[in-house]
Amino acid sequence: MSQLLQQLGTDNEFIRRHNGPASSEHQHMLNTIGAETLQQLIEETVPSSIRLPQPMQLPHGLSENAMLAELKQIAQQNTLNTSYIGQGYYNTHTPNVILRNVLENPGWYTAYTPYQPEISQGRLEALLNYQQMVMDLTGLEIANASLLDEATAAAEAMTLCKRGGKSKSNLFFVADDVHPQTLAVIKTRAKFIGFDVVVDHESNLDSHDVFGALLQYPGTTGEVKDLTDLIAQAHTKKTLVIVATDLLASVLLKPVGEMGADIAIGSAQRFGVPMGYGGPHAAFMATREKLKRSMPGRVIGVSIDSKGNQALRMAMQTREQHIRREKATSNICTAQALLANMASFYAVYHGPEGLKTIARRVHHFTAIVAKALQTAGFELEHQHFFDTLTVKTEQQTDILYTKALASSINLRKFDTKLGISFDETTTVSDLVTLLAVFGIDNAECETLSAEVGKDEFAAIPKHCQRTSSFLTHPVFNTYHSETQMLRYLKKLENKDFSLTHGMIPLGSCTMKLNAVAEMLPVTWPEFGGIHPFAPLNQAAGYTTLATSLKSMLCEITGYDEFSLQPNSGASGEYAGLIAIQRYHESRGDAHRNVCLIPSSAHGTNPATASMVSMKVVVVKCDENGNIDMIDLAEKIEKHQENLSSIMITYPSTHGVYEEQVREVCDMVHAAGGQVYLDGANMNAQVGLTSPGFIGSDVSHLNLHKTFCIPHGGGGPGMGPIGVKSHLAPFLPGHTENGVQGMDYAVSAADLGSASILPISWAYIAMMGEMGLTEATKVAILNANYVMERLRPHYPVLYRGTNGRIAHECIIDIRPLKETTGISEEDIAKRLMDFGFHAPTMSFPVAGTLMVEPTESEDLAELDRFCDAMIAIREEMNKVEQGEWPLDNNPLVNAPHTQVDLMSDSWEHPYTREVACFPSSQSKDSKYWPTVNRVDNVYGDRNLICSCPSIENYEE
């Protein structure tokens, strides 16, 4: 290729779109830092002992158009049959107003988990709607704001039964009509937490002494039956009962809460979220009031702000793993907020009457096919059903199944039966084509409809028909035209801060660019329309994508094999520790159960270790934030016989590259342990070092951090795990289509949240080796630039040997609080007035702020943030000097709202301009918090987790 063609080519052009600072700005930043070149900065920051000896072997970066063309070719390898498989996954219509204004909208998908409620009221309201929807449809008192998938929700519910119940038993019951993928995940969780599982017909529940039971309603084979007496009998033996249920079925069926269920779980996928070959989708959990403080996952509650106005927040956070660590009830962090929002908006848009129409149509089509099949001489397994039929096909099973495939139809095959599940996308012409497979040609569906319509709900027992009202809150009965819905979505979006407004400098969260080109393929039907349990040859595109992505990730990490199954970082940690424990078992070392964890670790680490019955032993950190090598040696010697592993994060959670990391790995290996390297900070490794090169045995990667899957306001996430070859046999399997066997599943689908994998593939493909390495270097450049600008004004807690930091820095507010009285929370809230999301507060050290700018923020935005922080420091000086009283200044009163600006009274010693327009940039483009500082204590003491009455909104 000629030099001119190279100059005019589009390869690698995405790199400058992704990385914020222009190359012409690097020198100014380096001058501020005190380095002559970017390479010098890297050499002073990353220890030479761990730097890769040669570049990664990855292709050069593709242009956006070239990447999309290649990915489209991969997508077109998938075959889109009409799916009647069911088993918890259904085709659905995503309302276009939700598709365009939520799923495809960076105002929704680039926001962070709503830990800062003052700038998150929109998605908090959407998630509260989700909770209300689940509570109404299940008939239970409280619900959480989503879990990862139905199978993991069932596993969480099992542990909740043990925690919240009074039974002394260690046995858990699973009905034999539960989805097989759910049973598989339950078995994995039970094995490693120490429970026994019995699978039996639900009628035999009373013959077992169990602490909890999981039933399915309707069952996986479609049967609808009243569970009231069964549940009541279980309660006499102190057994808590979980029922996995279907939200659309619950529109017509008696809700499980009215049957006495203690816990309801399930998936909200069919409420407008594509199947996506398994995910992501929002699972739900609802419980009785008595179990609320033990329930896993995030819960949205109603509180008030400092002015007494209604404000929403995440409630009961002291339950969560980042607080309780090894004593946490769950390791859940990221769930499925974006998908929960989509499901809640689906319910808002359709309303109760719209949902009834959809449910009636699905049931009616099921009844039509049932009538036609029975008339033709086929026998049904069950006479009572909602949307699923199981047809006894005996010797014809394989013939009919193959005939269906020839007609581009997927049925669910049992040994001598075929399952057929219907959904809202089913049409009359679909029924005609389907019935032809069973030898019923030119079926008269209109005639059949008239016959079935004489008793529309004959297939639902009278005592199983819903009589109670649901979704009565005005929010579900108002926004039914597209204009109304569009404006409601926009109103909520406008309340929230996202990357569309400015930098989100959250340490340990890597809030980088989620490029549009990376996001586009998520909505392609070739990726969205495939059932996760379709025959593998129909998912050739997904197989190609997964193989390619795993190969890329192996090259980036230095591992030998990957599993893409874990659908969150916490799930990846769990899968990784299971792999370690299975490895030890295979070598006759099942007694190895001690997990060493540095005191600086994220709370998920000890919470996950506890989930696999490990004994957590904390290793001290020294005054520089590094692992205390003397304490480590003592702990290894003390626990050598039982040492399973160590969990470390690299660079450390303190934001530095620890010089002795290889020595740490060697010491643990010498004692027979394995090294788990948490991939949360992989954004500071790519292209410069790697977990495998450092000496780690297994890591999870947060694809929603380093590899550009958006945070979605609290999910979706992806946490695939990479392993060295000796751990590869112990990666999770799956009961359906599993490439690693059938056992030890950690998610409902083998590829986890498969439909968002194209995002990470696209990012790597467009960046290439050069771009990925450059991104890491720029992330380090940006972080050190911010540190050097702030260091004259704020103490920086930890730095490396040469005074450098990795990709994030910790600012110590504790000494400033002693002299000024201003806390890290005051600074965080004041940043909102300047147009910024707060850094990470009080993690990993209480009383600090951790800042991670990522490589995507340009110099102007970095300066805007630094200027804001310096201005805040000057405001703190005014408090310290007595110019402003400690109880009445712009920091303790932050954030300020438009209502504050327009208030008739102003009883503050600072002006409205200082309050609301503290910088010139805020006058140019102002983001407004919609509530004042939220009262967390009030919210937990007066716990309300349902939609407030309409009067509250009117106020």
From Swiss-Prot:
Question: How would you classify this enzyme at the top EC level?
Answer: oxidoreductase
Can you list the GO cellular component terms from the UniProt entry? cytosol; glycine cleavage complex
Q: Name one Pfam family in it.
A: GcvP2_C
**GO BP:** glycine decarboxylation via glycine cleavage system
* UniProt-listed Gene3D superfamilies: Aspartate Aminotransferase, domain 1, Type I PLP-dependent aspartate aminotransferase-like (Major domain)
InterPro entries according to UniProt: GcvP, GDC-P_C, GDC-P_N, GDC_P, PyrdxlP-dep_Trfase, PyrdxlP-dep_Trfase_major, PyrdxlP-dep_Trfase_small
MF GO annotations: glycine binding; glycine dehydrogenase (decarboxylating) activity; pyridoxal phosphate binding
Record has DNA repair as a keyword: no
Residues with N6-(pyridoxal phosphate)lysine modification: K705
Catalytic activity field: N(6)-[(R)-lipoyl]-L-lysyl-[glycine-cleavage complex H protein] + glycine + H(+) = N(6)-[(R)-S(8)-aminomethyldihydrolipoyl]-L-lysyl-[glycine-cleavage complex H protein] + CO2
- The EC code for this enzyme is 1.4.4.2
Keywords (A to Z) from UniProt: Oxidoreductase, Pyridoxal phosphate
Q: Which CDD domains match?
A: GDC-P
The cofactor named in the record is: pyridoxal 5'-phosphate
Family from the record? Belongs to the GcvP family.
Its job: The glycine cleavage system catalyzes the degradation of glycine. The P protein binds the alpha-amino group of glycine through its pyridoxal phosphate cofactor; CO(2) is released and the remaining methylamine moiety is then transferred to the lipoamide cofactor of the H protein.
Quaternary structure, per UniProt, is:
The glycine cleavage system is composed of four proteins: P, T, L and H.
Q: What is this protein called?
A: Glycine dehydrogenase (decarboxylating)
Organism per entry? Aliivibrio fischeri (strain ATCC 700601 / ES114) (Vibrio fischeri)
Q: Which gene encodes it?
A: gcvP
